[in-house]
Amino acid sequence: MSEIILGIESSCDDTSAAVIKDGYLLSNVLASQDVHKAYGGVIPELASRAHQVNIVPVVSEAITRAGIKASDITAIAFTRGPGLLGSLLVGTSFAKGLAMAIDKPLVEVNHLQGHILANFIKQYDSENRQPEFPYLCLLVSGGNSQIVRVNSPLEYEILGQTIDDAVGEAFDKCSKMMGLGYPGGPIVDRLAKQGDPNKFKFSKPHIPGFDYSFSGIKTSLLYFVRDQMALDPEFMEKNKEDICASFQKALIDILMDKLIKAAKHTGIKQITIGGGVSANSGLRARIEEEGRKRGWTTFLPEFKFTTDNAAMIAIAGWFHYQNGERASLDVAPVSRLAEF
């Protein structure tokens, strides 16, 4: 019998619902919130209110596009955390209410696990390349920077992670410092394509093992811009493309140095990336370049699966469902999950 999973994602500022049937994507609907751009970052209260407005039409649209009825659903997978508590509460509450209404089981999903398993989303019109276990996943976003050894769909080992800030936060800070707008990652990436990545140098951390640190390089950028602007008030406007290109290269170098080290240490040559920063064109190109040099088999998620989306929650939920896992109706969202 076919297994149809409805996935619901509401961890931050994107309301999303998706339907997967036996691992194949039938629909993936996303409602983004533009209201946060004016504030230069996500405002939790505004995000929660927008989720309340969007959740019903988004889920209804996902079911309609999938060509199914609510009664056809086998289980409902939802993001329990980590994320903004108010946002998570909307998705969790809706999932529980729908589960009671149609008498279907609930499956809770770790948001980060969804990113890690994004390459397992199958599509009818796609090649559907999938990594073999074990593989390494470079998980990079606004809130996380980790190197994860993935032994199976449900078994993970965090080899390294940031000890302070996430790489996505560094991109946002760069954009904010230069007055470029929000979200910073795509803006910096776009300008970096027009600049010289070797024009300026930024100090890199010396952290043992496979852990990351991005607080120092943010400070390095701050002092660099401040000192140069003191000499020439037009410096940033004249050099914004080169600054973005150089800063982006420095961040990618930091990410890749530890990933290469982890791959050598483990002997694993199946390499994936996940999370919002995995959409960065410079990082994607560098992963593939290193893969060719080092004999890696690399897997890059489609751009639509790099940002927060319910398709990845549905596929992760499918694996949990097949493992016999169910969530109780009194389950509560958690803003921080210490481990998978």
Residue spans for each PLM region:
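Glycine-rich phosphate-binding/hydrolytic loop that grips phosphoryl groups
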Residues: H115-L117, P301-E339
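Conserved phosphate-binding catalytic cores of ATP/NTP-utilizing and phosphoryl-transfer enzymes
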Residues: M1-S2, V109-Y135, A316
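N-terminal beta-alpha supersecondary unit
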Residues: S2-P82, H111, H115, I243
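Short beta-strand scaffold segments in enzyme catalytic cores
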Residues: T15-I20, C137-L139, S145-R149
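Glycine-rich phosphate-binding loop plus the immediately following alpha-helix
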Residues: Q113, N151-Q194, K218-T219, Y223-D227
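A contiguous, well-structured pocket-lining segment that forms one wall/lid of small-molecule binding clefts
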Residues: K69, R190-I271, N280-R294, Y321-G324, ...
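Conserved phosphate-binding/catalytic loops in two-lobed NTP-binding clefts
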Residues: E108-V109, E288-I313
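Short glycine-rich phosphate-binding loop at a beta-alpha junction
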Residues: K69-R80, T266-S278, F299-E302
